[in-house]
Amino acid sequence: MERLAARIMLLAGWRRALLAIASGAVGALALPPVGFFAALFFSFSMLVWLLDGVSGNPDRSWSRGLRSAFWIGWLFGFGYFVAGLWWLGNALMVEADEFAWALPLAVLGLPAVLAVFYGLACLAARLLWSEGLGRIAALAAMFGITEWLRSFIATGFPWNAIGYGAMPIPLMMQSAAVLGLFGVSALAVFVFAAPALLGTRRGAKLGLALAGILFCGHLGYGAYRLSLPEPDGRKVTVRLVQPNIDQAAKMDDTDRVAIFEKHLRLTAVPTPADQPRPDVIVWPETTIPFILTENPDALRQIAGALQEGQVLITGTVRSEDQGAGIAPRYYNSIYAIDSQGQILAAADKVHLVPFGEYVPWQDILSKLGITNIIDLPGGFSQGASRSLMTLPGGLKLYPLICYEVIFPDEMVKGLSGANAIINVTNDAWFGDTPGPFQHFQQARLRAVETGLPIIRAANNGISALIDGRGRVFSGLRLNAEGVENATFTLSAAPETNVNHNKCNFWAVTALLLSAAVISRLGLISRVN
């Protein structure tokens, strides 16, 4: 191992760059649908040795060493994000004649931007780099911090944070209930990078012992939490409707009536005799292909498809009149509709997809020919705030539309009082690629972090009822058409506290930074 580490440390030029990119790309194997978390042991061991090579070279100036550390981290991140996000280009091919030109921006440009965060993590870790365990702690702390920064800078995009690679199954997801995604990400980097200590032997016994304890604790806590009894409470049965409509068909005006009628047919499918009647039916995001409030006949048809006392929750487009001569505002919304055709509650999407649902700096970019992917004048408007949808029977749903479910910190706002999360989405843009699987895993982690069940309806999948520990009670696979009835228990309160998760993340970060600083100061004193 020492010989291998020495060879990697001595790499330079294109060989070093190629290994950095390849190491990041291999790490993407830990992500869904593969879920091979062990790949990250290789990736982060390689990264540490590459950084050792630019940190231990006495011929390099301080500033040059920092630049080299940044570029190694950037190349590592570029490989990781290209391998993990290449499927984003699939959305642009739905209307290839209009958006194919942007394919390089999605497949290479976005990874190049996201890789800057990993470059900064390595640069910051280089400031605290030392021999032995301290450098592993520094790298782990900086990756945790930059993953957190990635969740909100420039609207945020924490997709495929390193922590997801450490949580492929429910047994390995439960640590998120205590540490949150970013705390798990930091400790995951520590564990995955620990084998690099075998390359120099300094601090190897302690580092590997700590990594082993963390990994066993990760599994042990998972087993403990999964063994806890289910919460007591009222049972609610939901029907998930998955129409599996091709995205091109959804955008074709001539198919709108047929699409709406298909949802009505699936809603009215008889319930098997051995199952309870659904209390709530859920349709996916932007299911209704017209402004529902402007079409009373559609509301009557919905009422006709529902049985007495049932409620439909559906994704739709909401319009808001702005007065004479002013174009209306449009919102990506959720409606709750009762069996009388009355709208009981509504919620607007707050966190919009840039360049998908709106164009930032639209006045400037529109002159360059850059427009929304969605066919809507001016794009969607941002919802004012996110609030609970209160339904009959004590059901209080926290609404998340599409990729709003990927933002852990947004769970803090307005979650109090909720007894379930509703997530409607349309992943048909991404076809049969890793995208829908990655999106689904992130929804499962939000369930674990909040301790609340998630009711998830997706146009082409994956639709599922997820319990508060990330387990899938019932669902429909990707690209399947049909309905699924599932029953869950309304809990009196969430099993976890997302505010505590955030505090615990910063506590972990402080411990890692303290270890890195102590190690760094010890190295300086030895040199002096």
UniProtKB/Swiss-Prot annotation:
Known pathway: Protein modification; lipoprotein biosynthesis (N-acyl transfer)
Keyword check for Transcription: no
Primary location: membrane
HAMAP family in the record: Lnt (MF_01148)
Organism annotation: Allorhizobium ampelinum (strain ATCC BAA-846 / DSM 112012 / S4)
Entry's localization field: Cell inner membrane
UniProt name for this protein: Apolipoprotein N-acyltransferase
Family stated for the protein in its record: Belongs to the CN hydrolase family. Apolipoprotein N-acyltransferase subfamily.
Domain (CN hydrolase) ranges: 241-490
Enzyme active site: 285 (proton acceptor), 349, 402 (nucleophile)
Membrane topology: Multi-pass membrane protein
EC number, as in UniProt: 2.3.1.269
Domain of life of the organism encoding this protein: Bacteria
